[in-house]
């Protein structure tokens, strides 16, 4: 594939991203246009018939927060309908569409036989535990860790190298594409409910979080075991973590 193909793919990706963002940011009384393309036709017809097709996802979330605030909405049927609109928008955009875009960016998942659980953590390595939902935000980190210079630096301080330890949902994303990351990704250690136990092994040297599924219970453990914490998004900001807001333009600086 030549430069023209690359530019065309990049432009297509940009158009898709802009379309998704435009849909999500619409007001609640404007229906999201991509919904018809990604939802099952019969379900879409039913949602349309019932009048529960959601407007812009962010506005729907805002309305839900306001409705559940003190002394506001008290109609259970209205709130149930609000929940249905939230479920439709987040299920189709937050799950289906997000996964489709991840497949475009990083390739589709592949079925493989791989070890999981605490046994994948080797204490002889410098281990970076990742938590969150957005695998693409770790792409530059992963690329840097694969370099011989970085791995040699780890060896200079007595480690065998540096590895990424998968935890929470982003760990499952890595596991689904494990064939692409065998050099630095050692496997999926556990979900968000076992992330505290993963840290208690004493084999983790750094926690990098980028979004949700980063539970508050890891804070005292990291403090007690002197495990450094970095957050790439203030949504998952922990009290004792350093915040490094991620932007595509500054990804190399952040990784360094």
Regions found by a protein language model. Name each.
Residues 1-256:
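Metallocofactor- and cofactor-centric catalytic cores in central/energy metabolism, strongly enriched
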């Amino acid at each position: 594939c030549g430069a023209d193909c690359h530019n065309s793919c990049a432009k297509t990706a940009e158009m898709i991203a802009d379309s998704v963002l435009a849909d999500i940011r619409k007001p609640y009384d404007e229906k999201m246009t991509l919904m018809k393309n990604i939802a099952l036709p019969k379900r879409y017809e039913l949602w349309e018939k019932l009048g529960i097709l959601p407007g812009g996802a962010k506005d729907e979330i805002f309305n839900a927060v306001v409705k559940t605030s003190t002394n506001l909405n008290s109609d259970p049927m209205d709130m149930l309908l609000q929940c249905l609109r939230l479920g439709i928008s987040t299920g189709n955009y937050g799950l289906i569409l997000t996964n489709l875009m991840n497949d475009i960016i990083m390739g589709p998942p592949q079925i493989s036989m791989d070890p999981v659980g605490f046994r994948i953590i080797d204490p002889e390595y410098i281990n970076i535990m990742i938590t969150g939902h957005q695998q693409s935000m770790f792409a530059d980190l992963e690329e840097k860790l694969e370099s011989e210079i970085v791995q040699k630096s780890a060896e200079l301080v007595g480690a065998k190298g540096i590895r990424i330890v998968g935890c929470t949902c982003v760990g499952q994303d890595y596991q689904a594409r494990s064939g692409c990351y065998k050099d630095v990704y050692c496997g999926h250690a556990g979900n968000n409910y076992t992330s505290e136990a993963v840290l208690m092994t004493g084999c983790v040297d750094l926690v990098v979080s980028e979004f949700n599924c980063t539970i508050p219970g890891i804070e005292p453990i990291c403090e007690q075991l002197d495990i450094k914490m970095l957050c790439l998004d203030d949504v998952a900001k922990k009290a004792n973590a350093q915040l490094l807001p991620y932007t595509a333009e500054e990804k190399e600086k952040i990784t360094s």
